[in-house]
Amino acid sequence: MYAIVYKSDGFPVCRQMPGVSPDPVVTWMNESAAKAFIASKAGDAEFQPLELTDDAMDKLAKTMGCPVQSMTFEPYPG
């Protein structure tokens, strides 16, 4: 599973949902799907795919300012 993050700070693309905090991280099933989404939005300079390993999830939680246990995920398209 992959997330898309900003190259500048590593913050993931999230879906805003009323009453849900932190916002769910949007996920793609594989790297090629994430890269295709980035390319479709002409976002190659700003974004990169990130494989959701345990270490990557710890870093995402730190970037988002929340415990890893409170993170939720929303598959694309959702």
Can you describe what each PLM-predicted range is?
Residues M1-G78:
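Conserved NAD+-utilizing ADP-ribose enzyme module
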